[in-house]
């Protein structure tokens, strides 16, 4: 089967090997006579799936032992409420606004905290650049500092996580890494909590990953629902309530796929990082030399995962999208809030897909310039 290239921002492409294995095991997982979707989450079959997935993820992301890995539900949007319900006892939380998702996080937190303080914002520049960390106005005694490390809509990415200690801040850093989790290594020495929906790089929608330092557990507000209390979830190995079993299974297969990846002598996440850099460089280099297309994001914070781009003559947008569909290049329309086009090139997107997109863009430019 010749599959098209899917540039969806999420739910996004899943590696074909993962889908094929899931299809083969759909009716009978490892001779159990059951589909994973039919298993009790407390049965030995699913417990083995869960434990393997957790161990593989800890290895892939080099998660230190003082961090708990939680498999939850609700997506990144729900975590915008769940995080302050768990961590905001001090009453003040700092937010760095770098795009739509960090804006949503601050707006949601205002329901639960006395002061959702905007420490810095890139809104004046239409979120085409990141506020320099040395310019952040961080609060004294804040419960935590929140960033979205990759903004899916605006295509802005922190190329490295900020070092709050170097900025004179003792608050833990909370990172929404939904759209680039497992695309590059994580410096856990700078992180207190990281969360993300699985539907971009790890599997299907419905599963949410939370990785939280143990000393941050046990501080939930009284109003926090027990199913969302990180300590309760951790104490029950993510099974206080029925977890998203199918999502955990597919994520586990994806973790195994990541472990098999190689690139220039590198393996796993390091291999994917090298591949992702090559994919992004290929695309940006073409757009930057073109007089027909434009990317508006500052070069030092361009996303490797989500690339918004615009035709200078927007009257040709519909023709561009129609031609792309004919070539098997799907879901390139930009988010409604910014317009234009967007190519999401997550881990599952092969470099051949980016090459095919660039070749189509070049041909379209030659026909219409």
Swiss-Prot record:
Pyridoxal 5'-phosphate binds at residues 101, 152, 176, 199, 241-242. Keywords: Amino-acid biosynthesis, Aminotransferase, Cytoplasm, Pyridoxal phosphate, Pyridoxine biosynthesis, Serine biosynthesis, Transferase. The keyword Kinase does not apply. Its EC number is 2.6.1.52. Pathway: Amino-acid biosynthesis; L-serine biosynthesis; L-serine from 3-phospho-D-glycerate: step 2/3; Cofactor biosynthesis; pyridoxine 5'-phosphate biosynthesis; pyridoxine 5'-phosphate from D-erythrose 4-phosphate: step 3/5. The modification N6-(pyridoxal phosphate)lysine is found at residue 200. Pfam families: Aminotran_5. Its cofactor is pyridoxal 5'-phosphate. One of its GO terms (molecular function) is O-phospho-L-serine:2-oxoglutarate aminotransferase activity. It is found in: Cytoplasm. L-glutamate binds at residue 42. Binds 1 pyridoxal phosphate per subunit. It catalyses: O-phospho-L-serine + 2-oxoglutarate = 3-phosphooxypyruvate + L-glutamate; 4-(phosphooxy)-L-threonine + 2-oxoglutarate = (R)-3-hydroxy-2-oxo-4-phosphooxybutanoate + L-glutamate. GO terms for biological process: L-serine biosynthetic process; pyridoxine biosynthetic process. PROSITE patterns: AA_TRANSFER_CLASS_5. Catalyzes the reversible conversion of 3-phosphohydroxypyruvate to phosphoserine and of 3-hydroxy-2-oxo-4-phosphonooxybutanoate to phosphohydroxythreonine. Belongs to the class-V pyridoxal-phosphate-dependent aminotransferase family. SerC subfamily. NCBIfam families: PRK05355.1 (NF003764), serC_1 (TIGR01364). Homodimer. This is Phosphoserine aminotransferase. It comes from Delftia acidovorans (strain DSM 14801 / SPH-1).
């Amino acid at each position: 089967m010749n599959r098209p290239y899917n540039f969806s921002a999420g739910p996004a492409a899943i590696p074909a090997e993962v889908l094929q294995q899931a299809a083969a095991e759909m009716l009978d997982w490892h001779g159990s006579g059951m589909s994973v979707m039919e298993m009790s989450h407390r049965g030995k079959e699913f417990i083995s799936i869960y434990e393997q997935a957790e161990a593989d993820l800890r290895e892939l992301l080099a998660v230190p032992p003082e961090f708990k890995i939680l498999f939850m539900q609700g997506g990144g949007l729900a975590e915008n409420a769940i995080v302050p319900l768990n961590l905001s006892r001090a009453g003040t939380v700092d937010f760095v606004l770098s795009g739509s998702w960090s804006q949503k996080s601050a707006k949601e937190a205002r329901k639960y905290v006395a002061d959702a303080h905007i420490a810095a914002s890139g809104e004046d520049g239409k979120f085409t650049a990141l506020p320099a960390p040395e310019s952040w106005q961080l609060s004294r005694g804040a419960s935590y500092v929140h960033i979205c490390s990759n903004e899916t809509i605006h295509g802005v990415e922190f190329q490295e996580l900020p070092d709050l200690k170097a900025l004179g801040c003792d608050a833990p850093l909370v990172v929404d890494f939904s759209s680039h989790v497992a695309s590059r290594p994580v410096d856990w020495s700078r992180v207190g909590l990281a969360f993300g929906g699985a539907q971009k790089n790890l599997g299907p929608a419905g599963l949410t990953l939370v990785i939280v330092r143990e000393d941050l557990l046990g501080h939930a507000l009284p109003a926090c629902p027990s199913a969302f209390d990180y300590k309760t979830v951790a104490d029950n190995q993510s099974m206080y309530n029925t977890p998203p079993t199918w999502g955990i299974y597919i994520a586990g297969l994806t973790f195994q796929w990541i472990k098999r990846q190689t690139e220039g002598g590198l393996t796993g996440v390091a291999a994917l990082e090298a591949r992702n850099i090559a994919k992004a460089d290929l695309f940006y280099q073409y757009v930057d030399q073109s007089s027909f297309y434009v990317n508006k994001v500052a070069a030092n914070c361009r996303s490797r995962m989500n690339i918004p781009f615009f035709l200078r003559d927007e009257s040709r947008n519909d023709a561009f999208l129609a031609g792309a569909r004919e070539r098997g290049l799907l879901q390139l329309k930009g988010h409604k809030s910014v317009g234009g086009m967007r190519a999401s090139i997550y881990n599952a997107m092969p470099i051949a897909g980016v090459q095919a997109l660039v070749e189509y863009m070049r041909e379209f430019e030659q026909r219409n310039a």
